[in-house]
Amino acid sequence: MFIQTEATPNPATLKFLPGKTVLAEGTFEARDAEAARRSPLAEKLFGIDGVSGVFFGSDFVTVTKAEGEWQHLKPAILGAIMEHFMTGAPVMADGAPASVVEEGDEEFYAEGDEAIVVTIKDLLDTRVRPAVAMDGGDITFRGFRDGVVFLNMQGSCQGCPSSVATLKHGIENLLRHFVPEVQEVRPI
């Protein structure tokens, strides 16, 4: 098994491509060992000293480090991913769905804004999320209120130094161009 590794715009995060489907649908993010319990692979990765976050997409795993050098962490991470896929173990425990809306994470917007929200989500799904996934992350819609779009940033986007620029200059400009009601974009 050959696992490709790619740098991301976030220097604390690397993207690993195992050449196999990681999640058939949705995404999964764990920012601590407690959240990692939903996935045997995430638990393995959190068992490596220095790992502070994991994110799974359709065909990739991104790992965020709290400390340490990639030259020391990378071999252990590659070994854990390879061992996991070689054993055929499931990525998610007990067939648990990857994307779960946590309590308090429900989408919010005014009743009369449904058409605007549909357009915003369509733009995010077709123009933003594929590009962000290439960098090992994901951005999901959370809400729209008083001209402000609220987005959740995951994976390599979380804590990335360039994420504010991407959010403000890229995503905000795109949404404002196609949806005049949008005045601002903010991370949640």
What are these regions (language model features)?
Residues 1-188:
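Domain-level signature for proteins that mediate thiol-based redox and metal-cofactor handling
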